[in-house]
Amino acid sequence: MDSLTETTNALSNDTHAQGYQSVSTTRHVGHIREVVYDCVVEEFPVALIYNGISHAVMMTTPLDLEVFAIGFSLTEAIIDHPRQIYDIEIIKSDLGIQVEITIASEAFIKLKTHRRTLAGQTGCGICGIESLQQIQHTFPPVTHDFFVHWLDQIPDAMVQLQQQQPISAVTGGAHAAAWVVNGNILTVFEDVGRHNALDKLLGHLVKHDIDRSQGFVLMTSRASYELVKKCAQLNISLLATISAPTSLAIELAKRSGLKLASFCRQSRYVVYS
């Protein structure tokens, strides 16, 4: 991924660089009213443009957009390998942010053939898929081994995760996705959308060539279909979440061979597949 370039138009110097902003509010406690400032998580339109063609507009927290683009491109099967990304350019405007991604011609031909237009909402799952059959036919199997002792590492990792969410700590409004190896959290990404946080994490793993067979994903969200799909797409063998799974997430985790653990709180967790 060394050939990638990034143009941020001073993103690192504006208010979006921290992922939240301060707003004036009126707080009511009983009959007492006071004007106070509160921190809220940033939600910003980010257009993903492949070879000059707009593919999706995602509502995301405008941080870590290069790894977000890499992760999204892989988990949505737009590319088969990170080498198919030639360049990433990030351009900020008053309307939002454009992420212009240059991909190999064979990947672009495939994208045009299977193109879908997404209105990327914070709970977006399979919006834009042309038919129900696509859910079945495009789901990849997981081939990396799952190690049972990883389950014993979940409680300690969850404690660590609670201490490594700076955006959520001040806003209470961000999801987090973490990579756990040998019981320790190696990296965490936060976003207003759980699927965006996961794409950022997975893009980071790919960009830095981190061995995805040696750890698992831990998330502060429910386990939904799109999280299982994205993990399976990148051959992740365990997904652990703090909240409940959906029925489709369980079904597809079983079908793909991905281990799914949810309700990961304190020393408890429930294994669903």
UniProtKB/Swiss-Prot annotation:
GO terms for cellular component: cytoplasm. One of its GO terms (molecular function) is sulfur carrier activity. Its main location: cytoplasm. The active site is at C124 (cysteine persulfide intermediate). It is found in: Cytoplasm. Keywords: Cytoplasm, Molybdenum cofactor biosynthesis. One of its GO terms (biological process) is Mo-molybdopterin cofactor biosynthetic process. Transmembrane segments: none annotated. Mo-bis(molybdopterin guanine dinucleotide) binds at F263, C264, R265, Q266, S267, R268. InterPro entries: Cytidine_deaminase-like (IPR016193), FdhD (IPR003786). It comes from the Bacteria. Signal peptide: none annotated. Belongs to the FdhD family. Required for formate dehydrogenase (FDH) activity. Acts as a sulfur carrier protein that transfers sulfur from IscS to the molybdenum cofactor prior to its insertion into FDH. This is Sulfur carrier protein FdhD. The gene is fdhD.
